[in-house]
Amino acid sequence: MFRLDELVERLGGELLGDPATAVRRVATLEQAGEGDLAFLANPKYQSRLAACGASAVILAPAARDLTGLPRIVTADPYIYFARVAQLFNPPEAFVPGVHPAASVASPVPASVTIAAGASIDVDVELGEHVVIGPGCRIGRGARIGAGSRLNANVTIYHDCVLGRDCIVHAGAVIGADGFGFARERDGSWVKIPQVGRVVIGDDVEIGANTTIDRGALDDTVISGGVKLDNQIQIGHNVRIGAHTAIAGCVGIAGSTTIGARCMIGGQAGIIGHLEIVDDVVVSAGTLVTKSIRRPGVYTANLPVQGHAEWVKNFAHLRHLDALVDRIRALEERKAR
């Protein structure tokens, strides 16, 4: 539990109202009650302030006078909410040690935690305070930086590198073979050995069941601060710039480079051998088929509509070339 003046002392902001007001958790405007700290990050929800039962709220300067509740005024209420949530929900503390049911073939620091069923191969390097969850598999020669945490059943293949303070969620696979095959004249396939690595920077979070393939010759590189959601597929030799965030079910084909601070919406697809510059936003469901060389927001999908309307519009779309030819002919006739 924190008093409002304690929060402001730690995190900044302007405090209006009783500084001794105590809060024990953060909550939404609709669900907040006694002892809760709510936040208003989107102005379209400001009408909900009137019925809010929170003990205090976090507001932007433009909304400071919309309520008489004790409040913290800050330039970015959503960031402030995130910082407060971190205070109320610190990371789980783990007891160092190696479970008797773990298999460890490399020397590890005394500060690490290795759970039951985990397997650590030879020549593995674990930094201080690393946590290896149950059922994880760490391949020969892999490197994991200090403070990183692997949840259950994560697999890191041989020679891959994970930086400091990373979080990898359950079922993620880092360093499996990339999809590399050469086609014979008879249509059969010859497997190309994937001899690169996956190299991941510091402070990266990787969602559940996300897969990152090792490079064919060069490395697959995920830069520091990148945030990956669940069930993302990243092909071999992909490079992702610092602090880029990618939502769930995105597929990125091999040898594509994505810049820093990009945001990729859920279920987007990016074909191989493209370049996307820094500060690009790709909308959900968009298929990227060519390089993006200017920052901005890019969308290539249709908004939802009723089925009957969609069928009618799609029928017109199938005849688009003919319609264009008819319009062009009419324009030429009019010009004469």
From Swiss-Prot:
The active site is at H236. Pathway: Bacterial outer membrane biogenesis; LPS lipid A biosynthesis. It catalyses: a UDP-3-O-[(3R)-3-hydroxyacyl]-alpha-D-glucosamine + a (3R)-hydroxyacyl-[ACP] = a UDP-2-N,3-O-bis[(3R)-3-hydroxyacyl]-alpha-D-glucosamine + holo-[ACP] + H(+). Keywords: Acyltransferase, Lipid A biosynthesis, Lipid biosynthesis, Lipid metabolism, Repeat, Transferase. It is an enzyme of class 2 (transferase). It holds the Pfam family LpxD. GO terms for cellular component: membrane. It comes from the Bacteria. PANTHER family: UDP-3-O-ACYLGLUCOSAMINE N-ACYLTRANSFERASE, UDP-3-O-ACYLGLUCOSAMINE N-ACYLTRANSFERASE 1, MITOCHONDRIAL-RELATED. Catalyzes the N-acylation of UDP-3-O-acylglucosamine using 3-hydroxyacyl-ACP as the acyl donor. Is involved in the biosynthesis of lipid A, a phosphorylated glycolipid that anchors the lipopolysaccharide to the outer membrane of the cell. Belongs to the transferase hexapeptide repeat family. LpxD subfamily. HAMAP family: LpxD (MF_00523). Homotrimer. This is UDP-3-O-acylglucosamine N-acyltransferase. It comes from Aromatoleum aromaticum (strain DSM 19018 / LMG 30748 / EbN1). The lineage of its organism: Bacteria, Pseudomonadati, Pseudomonadota, Betaproteobacteria, Rhodocyclales. The gene is lpxD.
